[in-house]
Structures are given as C-alpha cells and as structure tokens.
Amino acid sequence: MASIEQALAEIKRGIDELIPEEELIAKLKENRPLRIKLGADPTAPDIHLGHTVILNKLRTFQELGHDVTFLIGDFTGMVGDPTGKNTTRPPLTREDVLANAETYKEQVFKILDPAKTKIEFNSTWLSELGAEGMIRLASNQTVARMLERDDFKKRYNGGRPIAIHEFMYPLLQGYDSVAMETDVELGGTDQKFNLLMGRELQKSHGQKPQVVLTMPLLVGLDGVKKMSKSAHNYIGVSEVPTEMFGKIMSISDDLMWNYFECLSFRPLEEIEQFKQDMANGKNPRDVKILLAKEIIARFHSEADADAAEQEFINRFQKGAMPEEMPELEFEAGIAISNLLKDAGLVNSTSDAMRMIRQGGAKIDGNKIEDTKLIPAAGTAVYQVGKRKFARITLK
C-alpha cells in the first residue's frame, strides 16, 4: 500500500489542477477506497490518444486501490455538451449513443483493468428525474452564473443563440456526482466549469464536495490545436500499428515532450535523461521511436510495435514502399487531383493540388509536376506525403 505522500505524487503527475489539494489529502487519510469518476459522452465511435490522457490517470487510481467508475453519458450525450462550441451541438439519437457506447467500452479496457472498473450509464438516474426533478435541478443555478462560462459568454456577447437545454448540461453532469456520491472527478481542463458544478450540487444536497482533478489537453499532430477528430489531427487507439507509428514519428521534437508527459508510463527521471541525452547530441528520432513503440505496445502488442518500427525504417529510411496498400481501379482519363481525392489519399482536390505543388505527390516514386496531369492508363503506385500509398489501375 502506497503512503499518502507516494500516492499523492502519483496522482499529481502530469495534472493541470487539483481543486483543492488539501481536501484530497484529507480523503486519502480516511484510509478507504475513494469513489473516482470519469464521465464521457459517446458522441463519436472511436477513442483517440487525447482521451487516454485522462484514462491513464484513472488507471493510476485503480492501481492505488480506489473504486473507479467509467460513466457513459448516454443521457447527456443526447443533450450535447456545449463546452468549447460556438454553436449549438446537434443532439444524437439514442441509437447513435448506444452504438458508440459499445465501442467505448471495448476501447477503454485497453487501458483500464476490466476486473476493477465499474461501467455506469447516467440515464439510470437522469431519466428518472422527470419534469419536476429537472425544474428543481435548474433552480440551483442562475443564468448569470451560467454566463460566466467562457463559451457561453462569447456566444451571448456575439449575438449567437444559446439553447435552454445547453444551460442544463452542466447541471446534469454535476448531478451525476450527486447520484454517485463521487469523491474525486476527473476531466480535461475544458471541463473545469462542469466539474466544479458537481461540487456545488453536492454541497446543496448535503454531501461532501468532490475533489476536481483536471488533466491537460493533448496537442494534436498539427502542434497547434487540441487533438480532436474535427480538427483531423488525431491518432485513434484502434488505428493499425503502422499508421500509429508513422503519425507519432511525424510530431515535432518539441511536441514529443508533451506526449511523453501525457502518454508515457516511464519514470520522470528516465524522461529527463532522454532530454539530457538529446542535449548531448542524441538523435531525437531515436527517442521518438521509444515513445511510438511504448504507445503501440499498449494498444496492440510488443510484436506489433517491433514490426511497425521495421516498416517505418524500410519505408522512410531506406525509401522502400510498404508491402501492403489499398488496390483500386478507376476509369482512365481522370484528372490527377480527382484521382488522388477519390482514392482517399487526400481530403479534397485543393489538397491534392497543394501537395503536388509542394512536391509531396508521386507516381512510382517520381514527383508529379503538373497539377492538371491526366495519368496514363495502367497500374502504378501513387503516393501522397510519407505515409499514404495506393496501387491504382486505370482502365
């Protein structure tokens, strides 16, 4: 059993805020398993590495002997979290939410211990509130308090509409903590308002308020925005090992340390040694390979990580093409920009032309020079960037 000092050090590793720390210490001194909650609305079918930053911390609480619940917001998912949005999020159907929830359950157990994880659905208690319960819940807060939220404030000041149900979202999430009598709730920094709402509602219901622990948001592959599907800068935990490896190797050397801090389980002393080694001339690529292999081994296997490393070396350091790639057929006479888009190698024809101008598109290893090229009939390997290949036959 870890001492309180050791447990606190593990809990605080890589966090953004602990609100308030002294209350967590007091709860730890009670020498009982604490009730730890992480909630997630299943608004998309897949989990990416950005989500795993908080899941890793949840795993830490499991290893320290606490009771962990992964709460699936099947009810709140149909309301739609307005956090960070400048327009109203379209609500999902119950069918969408439940389908996504099944995928979530499969993916979270790549990190959490299934034997030590309780899965709950917040429709269990929120569906029972009814109209009277909803009105009573809404009476706990004022419109002025809700407008303290940065995203609501910006929309209000900008004359953009805010739907009434969006004001309810923080209250519903906060009520989850009341229903579960949560001791500690985890979330990203963008969830701070909602998490603190849980503290307020617990106090008003005569409960001890939960401690709020926020984790930093993982920066996406572009090095600018937070990792998200909408920004197309994410790495999915279910992606094939070679794709994951290539994406991790593509991040900047500076961003690599953010990934080590948020995603790695290595001792902090070892990560500091990596920094010192690089300062003394070690190639950043070699350190990045260690990061990529650690992450891939976690979500796939060590054998997959080794194979992905070898594939990367063959493809990018030796100039070899991958052994496997999509094989497609199209009618001859198609313009190169349309062909690359239809083959899934780029998102749009404008992306295709941009890649051609930058020298990032090739046919059988030869750079495409003409943005208006009509490729000749026959079979060839088309490449865009370093990772996207397709063997295409034009008939």
UniProtKB/Swiss-Prot annotation:
A motif ('KMSKS' region) lies at residues 226-230. One of its GO terms (biological process) is tyrosyl-tRNA aminoacylation. InterPro entries: aa-tRNA-synth_I_CS, aa-tRNA-synth_Ic, Rossmann-like_a/b/a_fold, S4_RNA-bd_sf, Tyr-tRNA-ligase, Tyr-tRNA-ligase_bac-type, Tyr-tRNA-ligase_bac_2. It is found in: Cytoplasm. It catalyses: tRNA(Tyr) + L-tyrosine + ATP = L-tyrosyl-tRNA(Tyr) + AMP + diphosphate + H(+). A motif ('HIGH' region) lies at residues 42-51. Catalyzes the attachment of tyrosine to tRNA(Tyr) in a two-step reaction: tyrosine is first activated by ATP to form Tyr-AMP and then transferred to the acceptor end of tRNA(Tyr). PANTHER family: TYROSINE--TRNA LIGASE, TYROSYL-TRNA SYNTHETASE. This is Tyrosine--tRNA ligase. It comes from Photobacterium profundum (strain SS9).
